[in-house]
Design a protein with these regions (language model features):
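Hydrophobic secondary-structure segments that place a key small or acidic residue at a functional site
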Residues: 59
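Conserved TIR/SEFIR loop-to-helix hotspot centered on a Trp-containing motif
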Residues: 55
Length: 137
C-alpha cells in the first residue's frame, strides 16, 4: 500500500482546502484519509481513533468536513485542558512544556510502531495499544 504523510502548510482553519486538493491529485478516496489533530478533551499524551464523527468544535476538522465530508478516519491526540478555562486559545497554540515534550515523544513513537494497525482501520485496537504502551503495559 502507498501511504502519504502530509502536513498542510495552510492555516488550520483552511485545512480542508489542502486535503481536498491532495485527495483529488493522488486520487484517494476520503475513506482512506487519516487525519491527526489535537484535542483538549483528551488527557495529554493519550489518543482516540475513530472513523467519521463530528468536529466537536475543532476548526481544522470543520474545514476538512466542509471540503471532503465526514467519512474519513481521525486520530485525536490529547493535549489536555488548560488550568484556566479562559486560556484555551493560548493553550492550543503554545509550545509544549519540557516535561510534556517527553510524553509527546513517547506517543509519537507508539503511533509510528502501530501505523500498520491504523492503516488496516483497526481503530479501537490502535487506540488501545498506543495508550497501553504509554502505561508501561
Amino acid at each position: 500500500k502507498k501511504v502519504y504523510a502530509i502536513k498542510p502548510l495552510t492555516f488550520m482553519n483552511n485545512s480542508g482546502v489542502c486535503i481536498k486538493e491532495l485527495i483529488e491529485y493522488f486520487k484517494i478516496d476520503a475513506k482512506n484519509v487519516i487525519v491527526f489533530h489535537d484535542d483538549i478533551d483528551i488527557d495529554l499524551g493519550k489518543i482516540k481513533a475513530k472513523f467519521g464523527g463530528s468536529s466537536a468544535g475543532h476548526n481544522g476538522i470543520e474545514s476538512i468536513d466542509k471540503f471532503i465530508g465526514k467519512d474519513y478516519s481521525r486520530v485525536r491526540v490529547g493535549i489536555g485542558k488548560p488550568e484556566e478555562k479562559t486560556k484555551v486559545s493560548n493553550h492550543v497554540l503554545d509550545d509544549f512544556a519540557e516535561n510534556e515534550e517527553e510524553k509527546i515523544k513517547d506517543i509519537t513513537d507508539n503511533i509510528v510502531k502501530l501505523v500498520p494497525t491504523l492503516i488496516n482501520k483497526e481503530m479501537d485496537l490502535f487506540s488501545s495499544k498506543v495508550n497501553q504502551n504509554l502505561n508501561g503495559i
